[in-house]
């Protein structure tokens, strides 16, 4: 992934703004999707139920990993695009005699994809994950940057992991592609009425797949073919309903659907006036 060059003045301004600092809903990612329009991969902004804020993700791989992490009960906080201290990474590069990322004589601040906090007694209290497509692992420059990042977190005694598309099922990626086109803020005043409607049928007919249920509803209510499936997709994409992202959407049944974070949904309900 390639970002535009960031001047030292801009780096300092972003840090002074509190980017890369905070926790849960107060955390501000060091980089966000508005900062850079030159990304070669699809970026997205998605609401996190654990953090109660919008997350900035720069690829389908990051999105798939985030959705998986956000479902893990033991995880308390997920912070994306977290900056590494520049002086420390420059020193590590000098010690290892490897190049540090630099553009127009300006050292660039490295970032880790996710900093994760969890409360499981069987796991470390926090760990870091770098999400990267495996095709980039053939590039010497990328390998050098990954080693800088790994050494940085090693010095802090924080586990660091590399995550590629080979570590996630193609099914999860297919689900992301199915949902992504509808992953936009929905101001439909009937959203909660739709939720109640479909939740009722998920409970009534738990054995039907979403596609089977949608066909039934389209026929029963004389709706246009595919209309109910589109509405269900919208509710899933916007996370009003949740399901296991590793299970193919064609096999998802009503019993597999969960309602999104209740507190967040109540806030939306109050705002919408329903």
Question: Residue ranges of each PLM-predicted region?
Answer:
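Electrostatic, structured charged patches in enzyme active sites and in nucleic-acid/phosphate-binding
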Residues: 1-274
């Amino acid at each position: 992934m390639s970002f535009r060059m960031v001047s030292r003045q801009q780096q300092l301004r972003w840090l002074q703004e509190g980017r890369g600092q905070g926790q849960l809903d107060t955390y501000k990612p060091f980089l966000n999707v508005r900062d850079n329009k030159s990304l070669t991969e699809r970026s997205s902004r998605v609401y996190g139920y654990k953090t109660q804020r919008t997350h900035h993700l720069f690829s389908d791989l990051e999105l798939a990993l985030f959705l998986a992490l956000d479902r893990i009960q033991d995880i308390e906080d997920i912070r994306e695009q977290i900056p590494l201290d520049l002086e420390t990474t420059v020193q590590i590069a000098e010690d290892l005699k490897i190049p540090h990322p630099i553009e127009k004589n300006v050292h660039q601040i490295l970032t880790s994809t996710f900093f994760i906090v969890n409360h499981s007694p069987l796991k470390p209290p926090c760990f870091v994950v770098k999400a990267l497509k495996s095709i980039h692992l053939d590039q010497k420059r990328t390998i050098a940057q990954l080693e800088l990042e790994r050494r940085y977190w090693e010095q802090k005694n924080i586990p660091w992991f590399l995550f590629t598309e080979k570590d996630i099922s193609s099914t999860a990626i297919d689900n992301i592609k199915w949902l992504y086109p509808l992953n936009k803020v929905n101001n439909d005043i009937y959203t909660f009425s739709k939720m109640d409607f479909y939740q009722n049928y998920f409970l009534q007919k738990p054995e039907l797949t979403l596609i089977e249920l949608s066909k039934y509803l389209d026929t029963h209510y004389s709706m246009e073919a595919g209309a109910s499936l589109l509405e269900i997709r919208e509710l899933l994409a916007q996370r009003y309903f949740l399901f296991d992202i590793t299970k193919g959407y064609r096999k998802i049944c009503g019993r597999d659907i969960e309602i999104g974070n209740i507190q967040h949904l109540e806030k939306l309900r109050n705002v919408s006036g329903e």
